[in-house]
């Protein structure tokens, strides 16, 4: 009996269902510790909190693993190796986009401040000292686990499900948007979207998730190092004897000072713009000199690629939009989710 090969539209629909289920699963994992029970964790050390964060990230990959097992996809395809030069270039890109990301976050923080919003401060344990163990736990959660999990799900399974159904440019945009909205942070929307699009481009162009993993690791590690330095400098400048602590989870949200528009513009022109140009040059070179991946462009006729295939994607975006709206309502004080 000949093996039945599913239509590309069926693969697209199945991947949309994965996106929907993963969104619900991820929200269930992070909603309670982020909003509803934030004060319940005040007795835990930053080390424990970052280990909890790493555990949640590992749990979030379960839907993708089950999806791969049920659909009998080969991990050797999803985890296809990349050339060493591609991985190195990916890491370099991840480093270059950090100043651009910070500048976008500054501009966004300025916009939120000018429109009456307030940046949410993450819950911080009151007494523990910033130790090597805490930094190591943060590194494990942010620089190792998060890039591996997110790249496998987004740039591996979800992006691959769009091959043969959508043009490459549309697939890059769709995956980048989904990645951004799953973070659920309005203040970081422009910077996360920029990073998500760059990561997706690297995966599509190289045909492997490893350049995007390298970029993701370099990006997160750079932000972590900057935050540790900022904590140390702030501690030295403060007259209080208590040591600084690392906010769990470590994010740029809540650490970005409000700037006026002129200051934000200066930051962009003097710091971020040269890095943005450099990033563009590196990405152009990556595109120009990387071997083509054989991305499956859509065929002329795709049976069943209408609403039956697209509704899971629409549902996933609706769920994530509601999740993002929760953050907006919190930012502007319309509702109070974090208890005082």
Language model features with spans:
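Interfacial transmembrane-helix boundary/kink motif in multi-pass membrane proteins
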Residues: 2-25, 48-51, 73-105, 296-321
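Alpha-helical transmembrane segments in multi-pass membrane proteins
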Residues: 21-70, 266-276, 336-340
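Alpha-helical transmembrane segments of multipass membrane proteins
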Residues: 25-34, 60-64, 97-105, 223, ...
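Hydrophobic alpha-helical transmembrane segments of integral membrane proteins
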Residues: 29-30, 59-60, 95-96, 143-144, ...
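Short helix-terminus and kink motifs of transmembrane alpha helices
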Residues: 38, 102-109, 155-156, 160, ...
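Juxtamembrane helix-loop-helix connectors linking adjacent transmembrane helices
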Residues: 41-52, 75-146, 164, 325-340
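Membrane-water interface of transmembrane alpha-helices
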Residues: 62-73, 107-111, 276-294
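Transmembrane helix-loop-helix hairpins at the membrane interface
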Residues: 133-339
């Amino acid at each position: 009996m000949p093996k039945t090969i599913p239509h590309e539209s069926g693969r697209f629909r199945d991947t949309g269902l994965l996106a929907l289920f993963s969104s619900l699963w991820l929200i269930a994992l992070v909603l309670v510790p982020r909003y509803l029970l934030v004060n319940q964790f005040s007795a835990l050390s930053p080390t424990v909190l970052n280990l909890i964060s790493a555990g949640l990230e590992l749990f979030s990959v379960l839907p993708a693993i089950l999806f791969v097992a049920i659909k009998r996809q080969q991990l050797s395809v999803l985890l296809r190796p990349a050339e060493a030069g591609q991985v190195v270039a990916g890491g370099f890109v991840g480093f270059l986009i950090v100043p651009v990301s910070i500048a976008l976050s500054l501009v966004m923080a300025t916009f939120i401040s000018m429109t009456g919003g307030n940046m949410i401060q993450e819950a911080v344990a009151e007494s523990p000292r910033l130790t090597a163990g805490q930094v190591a736990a943060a590194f494990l959660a942010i620089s190792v686990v998060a890039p591996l999990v997110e790249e496998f799900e987004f740039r591996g399974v979800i992006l691959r499900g769009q091959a043969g159904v959508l043009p490459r440019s549309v697939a890059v945009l769709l995956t980048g948007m989904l990645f951004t909205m799953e973070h659920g942070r309005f203040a970081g929307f422009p910077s996360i979207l920029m990073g998500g699009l760059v990561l997706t481009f690297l995966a599509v162009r190289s045909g492997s998730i490893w350049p995007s993993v390298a970029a993701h690791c370099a990006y997160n590690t750079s932000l972590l190092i900057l935050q540790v330095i900022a904590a140390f400098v702030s501690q030295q400048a403060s007259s209080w004897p208590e040591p600084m602590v690392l906010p769990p989870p470590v994010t740029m949200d809540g650490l970005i000072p409000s700037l006026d528009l002129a200051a934000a513009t200066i930051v962009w022109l003097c710091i971020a713009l040269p890095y943005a140009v450099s990033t563009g040059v590196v990405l152009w070179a990556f595109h120009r000199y990387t071997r083509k991946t054989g991305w499956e462009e859509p065929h002329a006729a795709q049976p069943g690629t209408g609403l039956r295939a697209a509704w899971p994607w629409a549902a996933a975006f609706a769920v994530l939009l509601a999740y993002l709206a929760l953050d907006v309502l919190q930012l502007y004080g319309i509702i109070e989710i974090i208890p005082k």
